[in-house]
């Protein structure tokens, strides 16, 4: 599993995104507003979705977005706001970042809500790959609603690309984070590591923590470093959405460990198998996981071929000794090396952050393959763990 590319989306999810008819300026503007609204939602088991109801005169009647599991979906949110304001939605259009759902979960199907509201024109960016929710477009067309798709598809895919991948693979999308010196050390010989990274790198990492669903470390990291694993601002205070704090390993977590925090949002995974850990996290609604260390857990995920994205903060520092970023990956010859390529998405492949470099990589495509399937190397079974 790796991040989807726009060339493969049609095959992967059956979307008509890249065969869509042209859209006018008003429709484009509405989709941009819907994308901006979607970005306000919380990440997790559900995708980020935004919707804008457009009147027959082209004005935006209401903008909605999904605020999390159990709350109104974006379409229902926008329709509800428009109705509360006394708007007549008969003949109106709705522009949505994801195909309207067609199932009854905690909330009713959005396709039916659109039909009931009298909306006659639906534009959405990409198809919903989640089988229970898919099929809204078919229902809408059967009811006589005009349906078009593909507007701003690339932007909509980028907004939820990790969620799309997680749904397709039925496991969390895994971002592996390493903060290291030029000689690949994550701590000095005496165990000190705060801080190898620049303040700018630390701030970037905390911003990333605020966008993920969960952060994972091993029990050894908890016992030695006693991390908080929260998303914090420049003053060191927890700020914004906080990720689930997960710990992997058999050893117990002290009651006074900082990781417990005030909210106690901690999950202890009593396993050393990365695949088992991912299964448990997926069952808890985690779709985007960041693995932070230490070296054993980083190496275990890499050796198992379960890393979809690498973010490396490289400090212009040399130690010569100390804790290496990675342990043995079971690779004995160059031909079996794990190959990675630069990923220009989400901030760029290479960024300068203060004195550091931020490197963003994804698994390289298999050189002998004509498709874009990532090259998975290393053992197929987990090794190590904390």
Task: State the predicted function of each range.
Residues 152-157, 222-224:
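Short, surface-exposed recognition loops or helix-turn segments adjacent to catalytic cores
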Residues 160-168:
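Flexible, polar/acidic helix-loop-strand segments at domain edges
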Residues 122, 126, 157-159, 185-193:
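Short N-terminal helix-initiation segments at or just after the protein's N-terminus
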Residues 55-56, 168-169, 362-364:
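Active-site beta-strand termini and strand-to-loop segments that position acidic
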Residues 50:
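Helix-turn-helix
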Residues 53-155, 300-302:
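Zn2+-dependent cytidine deaminase-like catalytic core
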Residues 2-18, 22-46, 62, 82, ...:
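Enzymes that bind and transform nitrogen-containing heteroaromatic metabolites
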């Amino acid at each position: 599993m790796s991040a989807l590319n726009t060339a493969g989306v049609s095959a992967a999810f059956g979307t008509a995104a890249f065969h869509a008819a042209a859209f006018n300026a008003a429709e484009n503007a509405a989709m941009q507003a819907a994308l901006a609204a979607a970005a306000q939602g919380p990440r997790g088991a559900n995708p980020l979705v935004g919707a804008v109801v457009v009147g027959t005169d082209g004005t935006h009647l209401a903008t909605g977005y999904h605020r999390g599991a159990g709350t109104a979906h974006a379409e229902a949110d926008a329709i509800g706001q428009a109705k509360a304001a006394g708007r007549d939605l008969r003949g109106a259009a709705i522009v949505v970042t994801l195909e309207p759902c067609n199932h009854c979960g905690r909330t009713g199907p959005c396709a039916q809500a659109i039909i009931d509201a009298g909306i006659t024109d639906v534009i959405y960016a990409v198809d919903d790959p989640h089988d229970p929710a898919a099929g809204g477009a078919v229902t809408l067309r059967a009811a006589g609603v005009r349906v078009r798709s593909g507007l701003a598809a690339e932007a909509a895919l980028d907004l939820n690309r990790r969620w799309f991948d997680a749904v397709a693979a039925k496991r969390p999308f895994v971002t592996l984070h390493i903060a290291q010196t030029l000689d690949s050390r994550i701590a000095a010989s005496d165990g000190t590591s705060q801080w190898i990274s620049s303040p700018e790198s630390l701030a970037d990492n905390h911003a990333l923590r605020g966008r993920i669903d969960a952060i994972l470390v091993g029990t050894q990291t908890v016992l030695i470093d006693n991390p908080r694993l929260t998303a914090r601002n420049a003053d060191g205070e927890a700020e914004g959405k906080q990720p689930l704090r997960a710990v992997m390993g058999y050893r117990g977590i002290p009651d006074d460990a900082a990781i417990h925090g005030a909210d106690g949002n901690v999950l202890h995974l009593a396993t050393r198998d990365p695949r088992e850990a991912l299964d448990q996290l997926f069952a808890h609604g985690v779709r985007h996981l960041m693995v932070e260390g230490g070296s054993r857990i980083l190496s275990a995920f890499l050796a198992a071929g379960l890393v979809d994205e690498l973010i490396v903060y490289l400090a212009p520092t040399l130690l010569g000794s100390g804790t290496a970023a990675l342990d043995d990956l079971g690779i004995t010859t160059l031909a079996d090396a794990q190959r990675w390529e630069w990923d220009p998405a989400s901030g760029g492949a290479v960024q300068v952050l203060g004195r550091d470099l931020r490197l963003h990589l994804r698994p390289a495509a298999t050189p002998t393959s004509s498709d874009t399937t990532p090259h998975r190397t290393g053992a197929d079974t987990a090794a190590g763990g904390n």
